Design a protein with these regions (language model features):
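N-terminal targeting leaders
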Residues: 2-10, 14-185
Length: 185
C-alpha cells in the first residue's frame, strides 16, 4: 500500500493525506511525521521567514521548502535524521539568496500583517502561523489561518507593500486542515 504524509505550509500546518488504507505501518509514518513537525517547529532558529514541508513514506523523509540561512537547512536535516523511525532523509530545502531588499520586504510585510487587528491574536504566539517567504520580491504566504477572511486579508496586506512583484497565497484555513485530516482517517 502506498502511504504519503505531507504538510501544508510552514508552521508546518500539519495535514496528512494517504492514498491508501490505514494500517500499523501507516501509523508509524504518521508518528514519524508528527515527530518531524515538532522537531522543526521547536527549532529556535526557525522563523516566520522560513517554510519547510515534509513527506514521509515507509520511513523515507523528503524535506522541501525554503530557509533564510544555510545553517538552518543543515540543522533541520540533522534534527530530522535523529528521529526514531527515520531511515533516510532527502533534504531538498533551498536556501534563499541574500538580499537586503528582500529582508526589508519580509520585515515590512510581517509588521503589516501582525499589526492588523485580524492577526493580533497570532502575533503573540511563539511560532505565529503565517509564514512569509520572499525571494526576488516574490512573496509566498504559508501556514494556517482561522478563516477565509484572514487568508484574504493577509494576501491583500502582502500585495499592497511597496516592491512586491507577486504574491502566492498558500495559506490554509483551520477547516481545510481539519477536513484533510478527517479524510485521512
Amino acid at each position: 500500500m502506498k502511504k504519503i504524509l505531507t504538510t501544508f505550509g510552514v508552521a508546518l500546518a500539519l495535514t496528512a493525506t494517504m492514498s491508501a488504507g490505514y494500517d500499523g505501518e501507516g501509523r508509524k509514518d504518521l508518528q514519524v511525521f508528527n515527530d518531524i513537525s515538532k522537531a522543526v517547529t521547536r527549532y529556535a532558529q526557525f522563523t516566520i521567514f522560513d517554510s519547510v514541508d515534509a513527506s514521509v513514506k515507509d520511513g523515507v523523509v523528503t524535506l522541501t521548502g525554503r530557509v533564510t540561512m544555510p545553517y538552518k537547512k543543515d540543522a533541520i536535516e540533522k534534527r530530522v535524521t535523529g528521529i526514531d523511525g527515520v531511515k533516510v532523509v532527502h533534504d531538498q530545502i533551498a536556501v534563499l539568496p541574500v538580499s537586503q531588499f528582500d529582508d526589508q520586504l519580509r520585515h515590512r510585510i510581517a509588521r503589516a500583517i501582525y499589526s492588523n487587528p485580524n492577526f493580533w491574536n497570532h502575533a503573540i504566539m511563539a511560532d505565529p502561523p503565517v509564514h512569509i517567504v520572499v525571494e526576488h520580491s516574490r512573496v509566498t504566504l504559508t501556514g494556517v489561518v482561522q478563516s477565509d477572511v484572514e487568508r484574504m486579508v493577509a494576501r491583500s496586506i502582502a500585495g499592497s507593500q511597496f516592491g512586491v512583484m507577486s504574491v502566492v497565497n498558500n495559506l490554509k484555513t483551520d477547516a481545510e486542515v481539519k477536513e484533510a485530516l478527517e479524510k485521512t482517517f
